[in-house]
């Protein structure tokens, strides 16, 4: 697998991606919407998971993985993030557009904690079953999962449910249509590269599980969440990950680009 280096612009402790319309703050690891809204949900999520300072560096630091292995775990864990679009970690702006991720590191930890650890190519060894947190140390699977779940979601589950209901009131099947439109748009350019068009069954499943996870009562049943995440990952993996990862960079406009250093206005 080939490494991909992404030249970016740094200003005011932020990594700015003007072409994509957002910036990553190095201080609190949040996303800021800049001059124009984020046009592609999948583009932002995939970009975050491909960017070494976040996903790859996290896997390298805490698991001793190589960059290629870190890329592998990052992309394969992407499917687990989609049901959490309605969690307190995500704030919605007007319409189907992200405003911020708060905090990004917790989503990364949670996506690793739900139990999906792919085998690295050429090796039978898998990632450990418990993520190592420098603040808490290694813990049992149950204790670590509960702690991550509460830190990432439980503290604001009522607000999450309220946000979900408000979003659904703005229009029928908003989330399903957003994700379906994105995947279909990409598929037009990459029909021979491993992408699949999402149908109503796929989108209904995503929406149903997302709604279920957003209900406070469900948080008491961690095994339900784990089963739901594993179930949905089997479908979303084909929908969200191309057969050849370089196609992603070519067809979603994520080629290497330099940022104008004059970005103080953002």
UniProtKB/Swiss-Prot annotation:
GO biological process, one term: symbiont-mediated suppression of host innate immune response
One matching Pfam family: Luteo_PO
The keyword Metal-binding belongs to this UniProt entry's keyword annotation: no
Alphabetical UniProt keywords: Host-virus interaction, Inhibition of host innate immune response by virus, Suppressor of RNA silencing, Viral immunoevasion
Annotated InterPro entries: Virus_P0 (IPR006755)
Presence of keyword Transmembrane helix: no
Function: Suppressor of RNA-mediated gene silencing, also known as post-transcriptional gene silencing (PTGS), a mechanism of plant viral defense that limits the accumulation of viral RNAs.
Entry protein name: Putative suppressor of silencing
């Amino acid at each position: 697998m080939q490494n991909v280096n992404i030249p970016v612009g740094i200003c005011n402790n932020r990594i700015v991606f003007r072409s994509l319309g957002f910036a990553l703050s190095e201080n609190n690891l949040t996303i800021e919407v800049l001059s124009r809204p984020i046009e592609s949900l999948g583009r932002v999520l995939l970009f975050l998971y491909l960017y070494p300072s976040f996903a790859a560096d996290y896997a390298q630091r805490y698991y001793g993985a190589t960059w290629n292995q870190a890329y592998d775990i990052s992309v394969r864990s992407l499917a687990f993030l989609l049901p959490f679009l309605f969690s307190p970690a995500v704030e919605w702006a007007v319409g189907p557009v992200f405003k911020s991720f708060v905090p990004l590191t917790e989503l990364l930890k949670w996506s690793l904690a739900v139990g999906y650890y792919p085998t690295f190519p050429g090796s039978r060894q898998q990632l450990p079953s418990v993520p190592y947190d420098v603040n808490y140390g290694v813990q049992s699977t149950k204790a670590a999962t509960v702690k991550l779940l509460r830190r990432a979601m439980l503290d604001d589950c009522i607000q999450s449910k309220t946000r979900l209901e408000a979003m659904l009131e703005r229009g029928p099947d908003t989330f399903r249509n957003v994700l379906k439109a994105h995947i279909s748009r990409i598929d037009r350019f990459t029909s021979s590269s491993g992408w699949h068009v999402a149908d109503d069954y796929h989108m209904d499943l995503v929406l149903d599980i997302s709604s279920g996870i957003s209900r406070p009562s469900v948080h008491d049943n961690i095994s339900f969440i784990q089963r739901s995440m594993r179930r949905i990952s089997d479908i979303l993996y084909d929908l969200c990950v191309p057969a050849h990862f370089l196609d992603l960079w070519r067809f979603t406009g994520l080629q290497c680009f330099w940022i104008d250093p004059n970005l103080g206005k953002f």
